[in-house]
């Protein structure tokens, strides 16, 4: 689900407004050097939109309680994939099928409909669960959080409804995730909390644009928006929750960067340089927006 496909996608009048736009160049350079632009954008978002979070958090929690009672009984899978969706019938079935076609079988797919009024016909597979929110939230983070909180697996993964995975995506990510992150001396270090694979970015006409493969560097992430949930696989934990801020079109950074950057502060993350995600690029996608911003 692209971040802009909500009922209020044109509501934001502040497309690409930089928090340093009205500051002098020397001050902007100092702020960027010490903090990075993306944390400053996110601080602005929290100040402007933080008052909306309590309401959507209450709705999220109520929906989790309501929907949990509808889930099928059975043993917990190894990994749950959360697919948020909103009125995307033309691409959702292919996204779901790409998860069901993974080389590992011990999985579950939870499709969370953001009050879109119904879902298209999807593959008949007992590993697929679909739920619908009581009404449209237009907050991608809330939709993903409902899926995370409904999961009972050891690991969770994420895929948008217009993207697809290669068959070995989960196997590749889980193999890396189950390894240990070595410390600076090459000794056994902390257990990895999450990994993200490379994205093969594809244009609407099917041509490959490029492969986005950036090793994790928290300092670099302060100024470059390379963190994306579609390649991210993590150990399920209470700490892993997506941002609940409402982000209409033009509000930056997006949920993926805000969530993974914050999560990486206390949880080791590593990049797996294998392109296992087929990521559709169009004029409204996350990366197209970021690539157009003047730094």
In which residue ranges do the predicted regions lie?
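Acidic donor-binding segment of Leloir-type glycosyltransferases
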Residues: 96-137
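N-proximal low-complexity "stem/linker" segments adjacent to membrane-targeting elements
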Residues: 14-15, 19-98
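Short aromatic/hydrophobic "clamp" motif used to bind/position activated sugar donors
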Residues: 156
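Conserved nucleotide-sugar donor-binding catalytic segment
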Residues: 216-295
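Glycine-rich, basic loop-to-helix element that forms the pyrophosphate-binding segment
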Residues: 134-151
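Acidic donor-diphosphate engagement hotspot in glycosyltransferases and nucleotidyltransferases
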Residues: 91, 144, 165-172, 205-207
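The conserved acidic donor/metal-binding loop of glycosyltransferases
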Residues: 160-164
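Conserved donor NDP-sugar-binding/catalytic core segment of glycosyltransferases
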Residues: 170-209
């Amino acid at each position: 689900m692209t971040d802009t496909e909500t009922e209020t996608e044109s509501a934001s009048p502040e497309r690409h407004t930089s928090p340093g736009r009205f500051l002098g160049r020397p001050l902007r350079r100092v702020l960027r050097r010490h903090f990075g632009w993306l944390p400053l954008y996110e601080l602005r978002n929290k100040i402007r939109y933080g008052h909306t979070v309590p309401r959507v958090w209450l709705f999220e929690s109520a929906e989790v309680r309501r929907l949990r009672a509808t889930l099928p009984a059975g043993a917990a899978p190894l990994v749950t994939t959360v697919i948020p969706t909103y009125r995307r019938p033309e691409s959702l079935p292919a996204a779901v099928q790409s998860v069901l076609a993974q080389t590992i079988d011990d999985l579950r797919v939870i499709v969370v409909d953001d009050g879109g009024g119904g879902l298209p016909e999807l593959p008949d597979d007992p590993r697929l669960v679909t739920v619908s929110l009581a009404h449209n939230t237009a907050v991608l983070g809330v939709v993903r959080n409902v899926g995370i909180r409904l999961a009972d697996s050891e690991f969770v993964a994420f895929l948008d409804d217009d993207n697809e995975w290669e068959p070995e995506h989960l196997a590749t990510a889980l193999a890396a995730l189950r390894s240990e992150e070595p410390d600076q001396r090459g000794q056994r270090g902390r257990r990895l909390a999450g990994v993200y694979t490379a994205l093969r970015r594809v244009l609407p006409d099917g041509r490959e644009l490029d492969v986005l493969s950036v090793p994790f560097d928290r300092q670099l992430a302060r100024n470059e928006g390379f963190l994306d949930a579609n390649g991210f696989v993590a150990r399920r934990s209470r700490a892993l929750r997506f941002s609940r801020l409402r982000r209409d079109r033009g509000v930056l950074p997006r949920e993926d960067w805000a969530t993974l950057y914050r999560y990486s502060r206390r949880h080791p993350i590593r990049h797996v340089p294998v392109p296992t995600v087929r990521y559709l690029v169009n004029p409204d996608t996350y990366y197209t927006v970021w690539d157009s911003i003047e730094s």
